[in-house]
């Protein structure tokens, strides 16, 4: 009886070690947020003036990662206010902020609307916060209701005031 129990016990012990290795690999590969916030609202101010309001149904904080980021997997809306208190809005079904790189990525049905009737539709948009520059290398539709123009193309970059707009390829 002892001769059967010892090999059986050893087999069970060694079979568990493979499971432990798999579990350790899984926990290393899977990224877990440091925190989650529901019905998230963040108000950015400068000198007691509201500069931007970010809202999202869900914010996942991954500041515990080697390259920290904040994710908005259920959509995001940001309202920006300029010096004259004009409101510009950007919405997307997904957003991610990389604070150490000062880069914001929005994707899935991105719509940027300005107070003066300009509208940009694109599947993906980046904002370089350091340079205050917005760009996409994807297809876009840019509508200027004041001028009555619609521009379609692939790839575009501009400043946040839309005062310097460059379309890479128009279609």
Identify the role of each PLM range.
Residues 1-171:
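Mature-chain termini and adjacent capping regions
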């Amino acid at each position: 009886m002892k001769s059967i129990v010892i090999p059986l016990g050893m087999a069970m012990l060694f079979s568990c070690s493979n499971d432990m290795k798999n579990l350790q690999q899984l926990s290393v590969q899977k990224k877990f947020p440091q925190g989650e916030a529901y019905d998230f609202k963040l108000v950015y101010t400068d000198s007691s003036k509201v500069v931007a309001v970010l809202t999202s149904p869900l914010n996942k904080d991954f500041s515990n990662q080697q390259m920290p980021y904040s994710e908005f997997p259920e959509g995001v809306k940001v309202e920006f206010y300029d010096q004259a208190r004009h409101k510009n809005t950007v919405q997307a079904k997904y957003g991610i902020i990389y604070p150490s790189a000062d880069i914001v990525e929005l994707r899935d049905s991105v719509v940027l609307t300005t107070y003066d009737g300009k509208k940009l539709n694109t599947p993906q948009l980046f904002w370089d916060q350091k340079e205050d520059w917005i760009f996409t290398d994807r297809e876009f539709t840019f509508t200027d209701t004041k001028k009555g123009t619609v521009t379609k193309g692939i790839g575009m970059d501009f400043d946040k005031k839309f005062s310097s707009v460059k379309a890479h390829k128009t279609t």
